[in-house]
């Protein structure tokens, strides 16, 4: 077989291309001649073809616009339906309790609820304990107040009775009381009958005016003492037949002058803090509130008030000093 080199192949290809170009040039020249010959005949119909072409293109554009509008409307409806279906699906998940957008806030709310419930329980227990403590404090305070009032009442009654006994003793020593009153009292007591006995007491017939005594024996005795004192002051010229008075010796010096209290060489006024000492009892502190002729009122630290007779200070039952 004959072998051709690359240079031979290039020359062959170049020769072929020259032949093709020559043929094309001949064809184009022939076409130009035909075009020139037919251009004269087609000049008359060019205007009609342009109008038809424009109308045809306009119709095509309108059709294309209507198609585009229809496609846009269809796409919009399809997108709306897809979005609506997605929202419905998400709503169903929320209703069923499966949506993550619902589960995460729900878990946070439940955790907060548990924490607040625990805190409320602790606060409730603390409130109950506080109320219980207040109740116990009130009960204890009421009991202590009752005990202090009982002691104060006991001391007051005891002091009043001692004062009455002292006055009766002073009257007994200073005034001659006839024995007839005591004899009459004893006889009346002997004549008294049992109120539950079946015997009925016969009415006593009294002629003329009479006096019914409704007073107690102690009141009668006090009235009798007052009358005897008045008679003694009105008739000093009379010869007294009373026995010599035996005055009770006071252990301490105590008296009140112009709202002040004098006791064992010291003066006490209202508002001062004193220390009260009683036999067989612990000393207590108090504040003087009132100083009368024969008694002194003072206030204890717990707020209770009580009185102290000057005669008790004189006898040594109580003693006071500056605190």
Swiss-Prot record:
Site of covalent link Glycyl lysine isopeptide (Lys-Gly) (interchain with G-Cter in SUMO2): 240, 246
Function: Involved in the histone deacetylase (HDAC1)-dependent transcriptional repression activity. When overexpressed in lung cancer cell line that lacks p53/TP53 expression, inhibits cell growth.
Name assigned to this protein: Breast cancer metastasis-suppressor 1-like protein
Family of this protein: Belongs to the BRMS1 family.
Subcellular localization: Nucleus
Signal keyword on record: no
GO biological process: negative regulation of cell migration; negative regulation of stem cell population maintenance; negative regulation of transcription by RNA polymerase II; negative regulation of transforming growth factor beta receptor signaling pathway; positive regulation of stem cell population maintenance
One GO CC annotation: Sin3-type complex
Gene3D superfamilies: 1.20.5.1500
SMART domains: Sds3 (SM01401)
Positions of region (Disordered): 1-56
Compositional bias ranges of the Acidic residues kind: 18-53
Disulfide-bond pairs as recorded: none
InterPro entries per UniProt: Sds3
